[in-house]
Structures are given as C-alpha cells and as structure tokens.
Amino acid sequence: MKNTTTPTLQGYDIREYLGIVTGEAILGANIFKDLFAGIRDFVGGRSNAYEKELIKARKIAFNEMNSTAESLGANAVVGINIDYEVVGTSNSMLMVSIYGTAVKIFSL
C-alpha cells in the first residue's frame, strides 16, 4: 500500500477513486509515565515517553486506514492528512486522526 500526502503519485496513473478512508487511534498515557516524563525524559525540550506514544498512535491509525483502503480494493491512499490532538478531562489521552482518498494506481 502506497501512502502520500500529495494528490498524485509520480510515475503512477490513478485509474479509480474508491472513496475517503480514515484511521483513528486514541491512546491513554500511563499516569506514572506522565508524572515522571517531565523529570526523567524531558531533555532538550523533548519527551521520549510522549514521542513513543505518538509514534504508536500514528502507526495504529495508518494501519486502520490502510486496512479499510485494502478492503475497498485500493493499492494506494493519496491526499493524506494527519491530525493530532490531546483529549480527555485532564488532557491524558492522545488522539491521532488520519484520512485520505483510496485509489487504484498503475505504473506508467
């Protein structure tokens, strides 16, 4: 499955548009990891604990979107948009939403 944020893929012809596909992931951060992330992992303005959760959530959302695209008969998703949000009453969850257009492509 090819994925791109652009509306086309260089070297390929889009032969069929199959519809919008989405993928979402909401991950609750471990409360103890949250508590100590600022102390233990915060180096140079970055938190390894949060970055790992972000990568995990993004992979889940991409897998969900690609699985839906495959079920439609697509071999690529174009025009992908990725949104990140912190949600929950105490901002304790991370949400990643991904969407794009499932297409059938062929090499030129």
From Swiss-Prot:
A Pfam family annotated for this UniProt entry: YbjQ_1
HAMAP family: UPF0145
Similarity field: Belongs to the UPF0145 family.
Protein name per the record: UPF0145 protein HDEF_1024
